[in-house]
Amino acid sequence: MTTLSAARTRVSNWLFDHALPLWAERGVDAQGRFFEQLDFDGRPVIGLRRRTRVQARQVYVFCEAAALGWAQGRAVAKVGLDQLITDRRRDDGLWVAATDDDGVVVDETPDLYDLAFVLFALAASHRVLGDARARPLAVETLAAIDRLMASPHGGWEEALPPRLPRRQNPHMHMLEAMLAWQAIAPDPAFEAAARVSLDLCKHRFLVDGAIREYFTENWSADPATGHVIEPGHLEEWAWLLKQSGDDSDLATALHRRAAAQGYRDGFAIREIGPAGEVLDGGRRLWAQTEAIRTGLSFGDAGVSALIAAVFDTHLATAVPGLWVDSYDADCRSHDAAAPASSLYHLMTAFSELLRSNA
């Protein structure tokens, strides 16, 4: 049986000897902007829209790497933050959705999901880099979100202009960002924004004991997709609720619901229905990392086995330090490259393991 101690050693070796060096060398261009993908030979994939959420996630990743003792991470994070600020800030205090490879804006849309990760990256930059720009930018960004994107039905709009369906997911990541800020530089505005997401979770997203994904403008269940439940998000909400100290009973209930209905063959699957029926039996890497992180926080005995299973499947690539993001219900993958966006998920789970004393 794999122990957490052995898992910690395996994670440390993979992260510090392979993944971080690979993505710091090949996953960043000459200007410090992060590529969206590396192919399975470890070469950057050119010509894709470079999404703000990915740039922000990678700033967090390399900040966290530095905090864990990988000193090279500081320089990568600093240049990435510089480019994030230079390329992507709008005049109204919000941030654009995407640029091209040269940093030219190709989508000016302010998207709440992107904005949540900008706030999260700024928190990491304040905590690890001590960057003097980070907190003022976070305060300005949150104020712009409240001013320009607040919905009369609660929470914030998906984007400007508003679009449907509304999703719980961006609000979940807003909570994540606000908790990160409250842990290092508390502010009433951060606390208020966290409360917005927490209240929506309990009074709108939670239906019959599980978090639903898609909604109408007034937070009624979306007619087409309002029944969808993602086990990975049950785990993610469980961890965030536990971190917030807001509702430990709900955190436990969501974790148990995921464990009871959301796994097949040891992995968290993509989608289930209200009765636990499988809607999509495929799986993605991010859901496994959420299961690992939440399982660690609850002291689950099966975490080390899940880590081993992830290494034997998702992380079993010819070039170490890459990953297979997705498998279908028949355990086949059709991925052509490793998305940079997954490294954030891996880092949140693996940093939890590396800091644990179990």
Question: Can you say where each PLM-predicted feature lies in the sequence?
Answer:
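Glycan-recognition and catalytic cores of secretory/periplasmic carbohydrate-active enzymes
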Residues: 1-358
